[in-house]
């Protein structure tokens, strides 16, 4: 039986350097004379799929005492109610809400979420097997939030996005990759020894379920947490949206009426047709796009009854992602090689490198893991501003690009992992600040 809890809000939410540690490889077992052994669920996967499993980082699940819980939606409105499911047995459980990004320090472990308290701890008593709660949310700022559950030495996290009351409370929206998070969730839901994701075979993954590592989204600390913290700590106020909110956005025209800029900071690999349509329509109506990682809008998925089905690569369906993003996915070496971006064009976007004392051939940052590159489908007016040359071999370069459309849209793409994850580094933060000033001039930082 569901119960409702009201959480009193705390006072004002609180308002620096990150070393990005990324690649975690899949452990296939003890070595043998014929190479490492592999679990049975990898049978039938091709080499590229196995490489992607390695990238996805099927990190061993946390061995710390945990509580398992999840919300029944990817996002909830400010001031509404959220339904939390707890699937463990525990005594004297307490729940407290936090806003991610309010923390002053970087997140280090893969099984921890940090933030500033949005409510006080509330005891909910004992839990046996499964319990569903209806929890009242405060009228907090839109953002990335999580419920932290504790019972003695046990801790669990249940993340969700707190969306605005209506689209366009701010003119900029950050879209977090909730579908990709679940695609890379190696949780064994039915306990048959096989992770329930298409990276372990098959073509489906559940969208509403707990994450491994005590409930923390995959690669949260590397790809997403640094950028969310940067936005919050520097007073860059935006609407936070989930993929669910794009799926229900209605049309590109509606998005364009609400927002001037959509930011895709993370690994936005999987999208539905409707998501692809509304973002393309947004761009076609002059909406600006910012892609701060790589391998975006690559796979088509369908969703039915909260189950995602992987269909095909968009480029094989006549809709190459490069026509929208500017660049298309080219390769992944699981982080074996890294290199700096090298400046290739100052004149097409002098604003991007302003104050950084960089000329042609100058270098900044450290990129790798996955890379994007221009293709014949890239817009003709596109300019390559910088690249990570020959990272995966001759001609296999990650390319940072920018283009503008006749309708006035401006589209920036990083071309490699990851500007968002490195935003606190000394040579990336100035570039990100320049990019923000150019593409979000009406939303200055307030901190």
Predicted regions located by residue number:
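Ligand-binding face of N-terminal immunoglobulin V-set domains in extracellular IgSF glycoproteins
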Residues: 68-91, 97-103, 110-162
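Helical hinge/lid and interdomain linker segments adjacent to catalytic or ligand-binding clefts
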Residues: 121-127, 133-136, 216-304, 423
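Bacterial N-terminal signal peptides
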Residues: 16-27
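Extracellular low-complexity, Gly/Ser/Thr-rich intrinsically disordered linkers
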Residues: 233, 371-446
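Aromatic-Pro/Gly-enriched surface loop or interdomain linker
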Residues: 87-101, 152-255
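An acidic, glycine-rich "communication" segment
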Residues: 295-395
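C-terminal region of N-terminal signal peptides and the immediate post-cleavage residues
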Residues: 25-38
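Proline/serine/threonine-rich low-complexity linkers at boundaries of modular beta-sandwich domains
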Residues: 37-66
């Amino acid at each position: 039986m569901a119960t409702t809890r009201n959480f009193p809000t705390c006072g004002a939410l609180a308002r620096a350097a990150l070393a990005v540690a990324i690649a975690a490889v899949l452990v296939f077992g003890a070595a043998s004379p014929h190479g490492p052994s592999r679990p049975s669920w990898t049978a039938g996967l091709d080499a590229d799929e196995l490489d992607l499993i390695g990238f996805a980082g099927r990190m061993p699940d946390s061995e710390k005492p945990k509580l398992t819980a999840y919300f029944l939606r990817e996002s909830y409105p400010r001031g509404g109610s959220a339904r939390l499911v707890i699937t463990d047995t525990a005594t004297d459980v307490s729940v407290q809400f936090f806003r991610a990004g309010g923390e002053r320090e970087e997140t280090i472990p893969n099984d921890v979420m940090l933030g500033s308290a949005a409510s006080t701890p509330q005891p909910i008593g004992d839990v046996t097997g499964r319990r569903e709660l209806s929890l009242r949310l405060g009228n907090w700022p839109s953002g990335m939030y999580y419920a932290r559950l504790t019972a003695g030495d046990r801790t669990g996290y249940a993340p969700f996005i707190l969306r605005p009351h209506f689209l366009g409370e701010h003119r900029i929206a950050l879209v977090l990759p909730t579908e990709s998070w679940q695609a890379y969730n190696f949780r064994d839901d039915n306990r048959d020894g096989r992770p329930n994701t298409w990276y372990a075979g098959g073509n489906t993954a559940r969208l509403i379920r707990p994450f491994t590592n005590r409930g923390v989204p995959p690669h949260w600390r590397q790809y997403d947490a640094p950028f969310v913290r940067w936005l919050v700590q520097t007073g860059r106020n935006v609407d936070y949206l989930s993929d669910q909110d794009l799926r229900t956005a209605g049309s590109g025209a509606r998005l364009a009426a609400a927002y001037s800029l959509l930011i895709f900071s993370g690994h936005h690999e999987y999208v539905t047709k409707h998501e692809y349509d509304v973002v393309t329509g947004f761009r076609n109506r002059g909406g600006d796009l910012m892609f701060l990682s790589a391998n975006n809008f690559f796979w088509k998925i369908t969703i039915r009854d909260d189950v995602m089905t992987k269909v095909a690569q968009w480029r094989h369906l006549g809709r190459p992602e490069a026509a929208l993003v500017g660049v298309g996915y080219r390769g992944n070496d699981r982080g074996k090689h890294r290199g700096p971006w090298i400046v290739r064009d100052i004149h097409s976007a002098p604003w991007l490198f302003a104050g950084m004392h960089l000329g042609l051939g100058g270098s900044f940052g450290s990129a790798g893991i996955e890379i994007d590159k221009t293709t014949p489908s890239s817009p003709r007016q596109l300019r390559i501003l910088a690249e990570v040359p020959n990272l995966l071999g001759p001609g296999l370069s990650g390319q940072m690009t920018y283009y503008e459309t006749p309708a006035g849209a401006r589209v920036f793409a990083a071309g490699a992992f990851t500007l968002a994850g490195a935003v606190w580094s000394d040579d990336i933060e100035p570039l990100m600040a320049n990019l923000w000033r150019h593409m979000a001039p009406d939303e200055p930082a307030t901190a």
